[in-house]
């Protein structure tokens, strides 16, 4: 139980420390997610099952999540 408590404390420090240095919460959260778990790549892997050869036919560009501009639906929510 004590180990779980200290793990939670360390995770909170790890997440909030960059905020005290002027970072934004979205940047901190995105920094915790590996690039191969980007939403675009997950959707592409799910969608590739529908296409022969595993390649999307519309030629959609998939970029690295950390440097992509936000999609239009994310802009509307903010």
From Swiss-Prot:
**Modified-residue entries (4-hydroxyproline), positions:** 69-70, 72
Signal peptide start and end residues: 1-22
The compartments listed are:
Secreted
The modified positions for D-tryptophan read 65
Found, by tissue, as follows:
Expressed by the venom duct.
- A Gene Ontology cellular-component term: extracellular region
The disulfide bonds in this chain are: 63-68
Q: What is its main location?
A: secreted
User: Which stretches of the sequence are propeptide?
Assistant: 23-56, 74-78
Listed GO molecular functions? toxin activity
Alphabetized, the UniProt keywords read:
Cleavage on pair of basic residues, D-amino acid, Disulfide bond, G-protein coupled receptor impairing toxin, Hydroxylation, Secreted, Signal, Toxin
Extra info from the record? This peptide is an evolutionarily optimized stable analog of somatostatin. In addition, it adopts nearly identical conformations as in the somatostatin drug analog Octreotide. As this drug, it contains a D-Trp at the same position, whose synthesis is a common strategy used for enhancing the metabolic stability of compounds in drug design.
The family annotation for this protein states:
Belongs to the conotoxin C superfamily. Consomatin family.
What is the annotated role of this protein in its UniProt record?
Answer: Moderately activates human somatostatin receptors (SSTR) with a preferential activation of SSTR1 and SSTR4. In vivo, does not cause behavioral changes in mice within a few minutes of intracranial injection, but causes a progressive loss of movement thereafter. Four to five hours after injection, mice recover, even with the highest dose tested. Shows antinociception and antihyperalgesia activities in two mouse models of acute pain, most probably by acting outside the central nervous system.
Per the entry's comment, what about the domains?
The cysteine framework is C-C.
- Its name, as the record gives it, is Consomatin Te1
């Amino acid at each position: 139980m004590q180990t779980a408590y200290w793990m939670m404390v360390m995770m909170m420090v790890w997440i909030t420390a960059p905020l005290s240095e002027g970072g934004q919460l979205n940047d901190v959260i995105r920094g915790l997610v590996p690039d191969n778990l980007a939403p675009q790549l997950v959707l592409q892997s799910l969608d590739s099952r529908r296409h022969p050869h595993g390649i999307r036919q519309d030629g959609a560009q998939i970029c690295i999540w950390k440097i992509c501009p936000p999609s239009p639906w994310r802009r509307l929510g903010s």
